[in-house]
Amino acid sequence: MLLSALSLLLSPLVSASSAADYYVRSLPGAPEGPFLKMHAGHIEVDPDTNGNLFFWHFQNRHIANRQRTVIWLNGGPGCSSMDGAFMEVGPYRLQDDHTLKYNEGRWDEFANLLFVDNPVGTGFSYANTNSYLHELDEMAAHFVIFLEKFFELFPEYANDDLYIAGESYAGQHIPYIAKAIQDRNKGITENGGTKWPLKGLLIGNGWISPADQYPSYFKFIEREGLAKPGTSLHHNINALNEVCLSKLETPGAKNKLDVGACELVLQQFLDLTTEDHQCYNMYDVRLKDEAKSCGMNWPPDLKNIEPYLQRPDVVKALNINPAKKSGWTECAGMVHMAFTAKNSIPSVHLLPGLIESGINVLLFSGDKDLICNHIGTETLIHNMDWKGGTGFETSPGVWAPRHDWSFEGEPAGIYQSARNLTYVLFYNSSHMVPFDNPRQSRDMLDRFMKVDIASIGGQPSDSRIDGEKLPQTAVGGQANSTAAEQNEKERLKQTEMHAYTKSGEAVLIIVIIGVIAWGFFIWRSRRTRRGYKGVSNNDMSDSTSVLSRFQNKHSGRDVEAGDFDEAELDQLHSPSIEREDYAVGEASDDDDHIISHPETGGNRQSS
């Protein structure tokens, strides 16, 4: 025990001090191909309590018109962001407990991707067990300290457009962190320094407004046909819902993050519908789970993540501080119990100010999630006031339309947007949208960040709003690696050679035209030497130089392309030069239609 305590006290002295110390040189089980550039390890945020946050950073595969960084957070509170890294938006998915494969919907395509186990004590992060956090503002303060030190280590990312994304209880974390960043930036403006360009927030199936979302449990259960009217189940759940609604009307209840009477609605539904030791999966009601778990064993990939992240070679590869002795767990029960947030107001109260300050916000929901269901998200939007309107009101009594979204020919969901807030509903999707719809969720991210891949190329995805094709976003190719750099050099060399060839062909055509024009001029000058009357009745034969004749011609008007007869130009066309050799581009049929863009504190600390 004494040695363990001593190692924790000494850990800041032996912690990494430069970016090179965080470099991930290899990753057990990684697929063949160019190795991704990544860094991982701990950053100290509170020396008094040995508070350290673990991060894992992936460099983007491509840069499209500007540098971007996306921070991803899972919820709980107390659930590791390695869930997001290995089951949702990271570059890899686990095939088994020792083999990785590429994720087809990876979010590091056009953005640097930063996963953080937050708050301290979560996942690979650690702190003294008697110093776990209790409030949202404490968590946000730690996170700003983390970012200060991260950007000191990696200053090349400090000016990236910054986005914060996550799901479930991260719906509380993200707005609080955004507000803390804004407060920090204001201080930087006054005292000098680099502001972090925070551009947007993305929250999936978020726990944001308990007062709006608790009543949605019964509404969702009814709408999905999980409790038929007239049955005892329906009667019992409705009675519990009435108690919840009554409790929410008591003074101060709407500013609480956890209302016990409302938690009972979900808990009793799961208990009363348990049959043959099987209950509904509260994260995907299309599925069942063993009794008492009710979704805690889901997704199926989960069984591979813990063994993989507890492997000694993986722990070493990720530069885990030896002072972290307990090993990785998905959700830390002690962190969850400590994080009561009794003195914190729900993050929904922060969203209007963030939006009005110019930050774009995107809320997205999978339609089969119960615990943070889409009805609750739609209700909180409907009741929220921001930028001079209520909900998706575009003018008094007029609401922004819902647009049908299709992806590669299949219905994907619905888009709705007004005044810097966008809502996306994903069809056939769970609490973890990117797990079910990896490529569609990446398409959503790219559009929200306004990614422009016009200069990159690649095979675009077919994404449409109300049948109208959206700008291209998807692209393939090598990652940022040695092989990628070599391929890029080769591509530039070929481009230069192609340009040189084209320029040579262009010069040849000009020379041919010049020779013919010169010969024609000589022939005409011999015939008209006796005195040709020009249009202005001037005798052109008196001109003594070729230059003066060109000057006389130029004094009229500029020569336009339309002055030439196409038939004459065709006569100059060399049969050895094909049209595609000197074509400079083709018309694009892309249109200009652009859509800009909890893991509750209840029974389970979810992903």
UniProtKB/Swiss-Prot annotation:
SUPFAM superfamilies, sorted: alpha/beta-Hydrolases
Pfam families: Peptidase_S10 (PF00450)
Enzymatic reactions: Preferential release of a C-terminal arginine or lysine residue
GO CC annotations, alphabetized: membrane; trans-Golgi network
Classification via InterPro entries: AB_hydrolase_fold, Peptidase_S10, Ser_caboxypep_ser_AS
Cellular compartment(s): Golgi apparatus, trans-Golgi network membrane
Topology term for the membrane: Single-pass type I membrane protein
Gene Ontology terms describing biological process: antibiotic biosynthetic process; apoptotic process; monocarboxylic acid biosynthetic process; proteolysis
EC number from the UniProt entry: 3.4.16.6
Residue numbers spanned by region Disordered: 458-487, 532-607
Family as reported in the entry's similarity comment: Belongs to the peptidase S10 family.
Stated name of the protein: Pheromone-processing carboxypeptidase kex1
Species of the source: Penicillium rubens (strain ATCC 28089 / DSM 1075 / NRRL 1951 / Wisconsin 54-1255) (Penicillium chrysogenum)
